[in-house]
């Protein structure tokens, strides 16, 4: 597997496709460029999903996230683009991407984008676990 930025997301078979289970990931070092100023934007991305038949492979996810480092994107655009790419690669039952951008001009921006597979309904009372953030960048 390469160790340079890549737009390719690799997957592996869900080990328990008959069960809904929650996968939680944090990407505390996401960077892209502001399309207006060219200055770097930094964010912590929080990915929560319930896989269907495939799970995203972690190293490919890291290299995919790294591929945005030199690209200009508005916060709302990049969050939705990443979600769309992850959904296209994994076809999850449910996926939520939360992007917590660091302060810019005195304003923190959080963008939350969600996908729900057509026809999928969670079992009654599915509460997604709240994980303590491991990043020291923002609470």
Swiss-Prot record:
Localisation per UniProt entry: Cytoplasm
Residues forming the catalytic site: 34, 41
Family annotation (InterPro entries): GTP-CH-I_C/QueF (IPR043133), NADPH_dep_7-cyano-7-deazaG_red (IPR050084), QueF (IPR029500), QueF_type1 (IPR016856)
Catalytic activity line of the entry: 7-aminomethyl-7-carbaguanine + 2 NADP(+) = 7-cyano-7-deazaguanine + 2 NADPH + 3 H(+)
GO CC term, one of those recorded: cytoplasm
GO biological process, one term: queuosine biosynthetic process
Pathway(s) the chain acts in: tRNA modification; tRNA-queuosine biosynthesis
Gene Ontology molecular functions: preQ1 synthase activity
UniProt cross-references to Pfam families, sorted A to Z: QueF
UniProt entry tagged with the keyword Lyase: no
E.C. no: 1.7.1.13
Annotated positions binding substrate: 56-58, 75-76
Keywords: Cytoplasm, NADP, Oxidoreductase, Queuosine biosynthesis
PANTHER family: NADPH-DEPENDENT 7-CYANO-7-DEAZAGUANINE REDUCTASE (PTHR34354:SF1)
Role noted for this protein: Catalyzes the NADPH-dependent reduction of 7-cyano-7-deazaguanine (preQ0) to 7-aminomethyl-7-deazaguanine (preQ1).
HAMAP family with a match to the protein in the record: QueF_type1 (MF_00818)
Family listed: Belongs to the GTP cyclohydrolase I family. QueF type 1 subfamily.
NCBIfam families recorded: QueF-II
Protein name: NADPH-dependent 7-cyano-7-deazaguanine reductase
Species assigned in the record: Thiobacillus denitrificans (strain ATCC 25259 / T1)
